[in-house]
């Protein structure tokens, strides 16, 4: 799964339809798609926004739809580009807690961030500058 910094939601689709879209491409049956999409949206606190389109949601809500889309199918790896960048600190903590739980369940998380506090939550921190690894060290260990 991939969590885009810029959401990349389809404006004409509702939140639940945006989350279901990658599941369609996996060939998943409609009932299972709907169940997984609903559970993912509930997990990010958007159970009351499932029928809303992106233009009807705040930036933080759109980011949470993007996160739900990435995690709905429980992929083995999630690449997250600034996943909490558009969220308030409380919502950001909830998202990081969710990513941590996914990691405990066996999902690998690759987190791209400029936020040092967020980076410190990881088990391993690789710092890249101009395309080169300049450090590779242990973090405090969320994931």
Where are the regions that the model predicts?
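Conserved beta-strand-loop-alpha-helix hinge in the C-terminal portion
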Residues: 124, 132-143
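ABC family nucleotide-binding domain
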Residues: 1-128
């Amino acid at each position: 799964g991939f969590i885009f910094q810029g959401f990349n939601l389809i404006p004409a689709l509702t939140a639940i339809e945006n989350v279901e879209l990658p599941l369609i491409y996996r060939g998943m049956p409609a009932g299972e798609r709907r169940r997984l999409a609903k559970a993912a949206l509930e997990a990010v606190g958007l159970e009351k926004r499932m029928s809303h389109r992106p233009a009807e949601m705040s930036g933080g809500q759109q980011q949470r739809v993007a996160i739900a889309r990435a995690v709905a199918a429980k992929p083995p790896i999630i690449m997250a580009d600034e996943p909490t960048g558009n969220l308030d600190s409380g919502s950001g903590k909830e998202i990081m807690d969710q990513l941590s739980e996914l990691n405990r369940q066996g999902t690998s998380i690759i987190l791209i961030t400029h936020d040092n506090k967020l980076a410190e939550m990881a088990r391993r921190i690789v710092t890249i500058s101009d395309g080169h690894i300049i450090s590779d060290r242990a973090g405090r260990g969320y994931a």
